[in-house]
């Protein structure tokens, strides 16, 4: 596909208007694939965050009174706009983020549209609750919008993660100030341009800028009714602390070191494909990536060479090329972090079975392209098995039986994703239930559709997204207790 032409400069989207940062600050957006300049973006200030919040609270006065049918119609309209501009948005995402166009065309953009449609359906199907407690009292339970939410989006799935946050917040009747990552803001800015005028002014606001500046202003802002964050556990902890200090809720989708478990009765070809899908999809920059591959000892000697061969055949290339299977890491900082873990693995006594280095020649030399990497001779106590690398790097750990692999899989501070590969459905269900994680796949990996709750155990987060239950996080409960009797309570004497 051909690259698209972007605006030379993007402002902040506040109260339905585009404006420069209050202090005029900007930053350059560059493609991680070739270092080319893409656009100039506004660096949001503290005053800009306050202005966006004020606009959102003003809009909330009327937005909260809209009916589910009205909001559902707008959500469906947004989904239609996304579909109509799929090729454009997909290419913007690939240019800005470095992920292959085949992923943005088939996963990121279409799934984002489906999230808006899903939550439109959820609110139309919601019927509320009323209970007759006894002959005297009727209890009505309502869920009301919580207010203005501060939402912070990561760089690994900028457009899709924005949909995960934006669709339910709008469905619930809330307003939002959304901050995409500085590393990949352009698809969200283009989205704001495309839906300009669809939502009432102030309902949806976009503030761009560095996490250390604009992101910190979001955390320090006093007027959000809730915070929602996807990103690292380290930053997520700060988000949780900021919310706790103000006694507001926070939804946190954080890091992972997920176990991808292969028993000897798995379908072998499917298993090899699944190991690649688990760690090479999106260049391994996936919070639930299958970065710990557990292989039963009876097939280990067959499995590892086959996986090495498969890894070495992966087509790494420029993200806008149709035949590219794996694109660029997000930036130079990230690829240096990945390479540092390769060195740590060597120091710990592990073996680099394939990859372990970046591309330094040809058309990929100017970008942050990593070779698919497999590390063997690993024990679960090594740093490369415990710490999130966030790249196309998997460790392979041998196990003997079911009890052993469950125990070792659970020996992690994280609990976000995981998978089990076997033809024995009873074994699959046992392992899926016993591994301490929020999402377990069986004979597949990295499927993240709407209507299936996604979120973590342990330090992998708080709350569940991509399911109607997230609406509970964006609303608050009101109980109306009605006395059906005209008689006094009898607690106090009457004349």
Question: What kind of feature is each model-predicted range?
Answer:
Residues 35, 71, 93, 116, ...:
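Residue-level signal for inorganic ion chemistry
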Residues 1-33, 357:
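Hydrophobic face of amphipathic alpha-helices that form TPR/SEL1-like repeat modules
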Residues 36-39, 261, 315, 365-495:
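Conserved C-terminal structural/oligomerization subdomain of aldehyde/semialdehyde dehydrogenase
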Residues 234-379, 442, 489-494:
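ALDH superfamily catalytic-core signature
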Residues 36-126, 136:
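Glycine-rich loop-to-alpha-helix module at the N-terminal edge of alpha/beta enzyme cores
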Residues 37-44, 59-65, 151, 260-263, ...:
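Short, well-ordered beta-strand elements within core beta-sheets of diverse protein domains
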Residues 128-270, 399:
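Rossmann-like NAD(P) dinucleotide-binding subdomain of oxidoreductase/dehydrogenase enzymes
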Residues 60, 64, 79-86, 90, ...:
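Structural signal for hydrophobic packing residues in well-ordered secondary-structure cores
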């Amino acid at each position: 596909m051909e690259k698209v032409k972007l605006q030379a400069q993007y402002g902040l989207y506040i109260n339905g208007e585009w404006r420069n940062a209050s202090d005029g600050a900007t930053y350059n957006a560059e493609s991680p694939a070739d270092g080319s300049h893409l656009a100039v973006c506004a660096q949001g200030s503290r005053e800009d965050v306050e202005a966006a919040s004020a606009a959102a609270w003003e809009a909330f006065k009327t937005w909260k009174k809209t009916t589910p049918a009205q909001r559902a119609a707008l959500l469906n309209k947004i989904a239609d706009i996304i579909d109509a501009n799929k090729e454009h948005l997909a290419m913007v995402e690939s240019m800005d983020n470095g992920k292959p166009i085949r992923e943005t065309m088939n996963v990121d953009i279409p799934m984002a549209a489906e999230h808006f449609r899903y939550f439109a359906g959820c609110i139309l199907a919601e019927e509320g609750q009323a209970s007759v407690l006894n002959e005297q009292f009727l209890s009505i339970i309502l869920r009301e919008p919580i207010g203005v939410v501060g939402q912070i989006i990561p760089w690994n799935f900028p457009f899709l993660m924005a949909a995960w946050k934006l669709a339910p917040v709008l469905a619930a009747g809330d307003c939002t100030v959304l901050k995409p990552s500085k590393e990949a803001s352009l698809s969200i800015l283009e989205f704001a341009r495309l839906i300009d005028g669809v939502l009432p002014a102030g309902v949806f606001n976009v503030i761009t800028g560095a996490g250390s500046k604009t992101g910190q202003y979001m955390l320090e802002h006093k007027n959000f009714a809730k915070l929602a964050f996807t990103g690292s556990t380290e930053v997520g902890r700060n988000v949780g602390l900021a919310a706790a200090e103000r006694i507001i809720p926070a939804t946190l989708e954080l890091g992972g070191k997920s176990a991808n478990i292969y028993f000897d009765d798995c379908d072998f070809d499917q298993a090899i494909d699944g190991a690649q899908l688990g760690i090479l999809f999106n260049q391994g920059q996936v919070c639930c990536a299958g970065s710990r591959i557990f292989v039963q000892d009876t097939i280990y000697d067959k499995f590892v060479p086959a996986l090495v061969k498969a890894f070495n055949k992966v087509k790494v290339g420029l993200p806008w090329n149709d035949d590219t299977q794996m694109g660029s890491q997000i930036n130079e900082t990230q690829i240096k972090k990945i390479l540092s873990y390769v060195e740590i693995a060597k120091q710990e006594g592990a073996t680099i079975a394939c990859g372990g280095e970046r591309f330094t020649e040809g058309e990929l030399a100017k970008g942050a392209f990593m070779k698919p990497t497999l590390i063997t001779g690993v024990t679960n106590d090594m740093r490369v098995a415990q710490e999130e690398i966030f790249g196309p790097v998997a460790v392979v750990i041998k196990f003997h039986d079911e009890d052993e692999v469950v125990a070792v899989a659970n020996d992690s501070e994280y609990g976000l994703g995981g998978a089990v590969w076997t033809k024995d459905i009873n074994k699959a269900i046992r392992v899926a239930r016993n591994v301490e994680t929020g999402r377990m796949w069986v004979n597949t990996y990295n499927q993240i559709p709407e209507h299936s709750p996604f979120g973590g155990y342990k330090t992998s987060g708080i709350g569940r997204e991509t399911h109607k239950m997230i609406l509970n996080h964006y609303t608050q409960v009101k109980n109306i207790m009605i006395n059906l009797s005209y008689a006094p309570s009898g607690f106090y004497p009457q004349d």
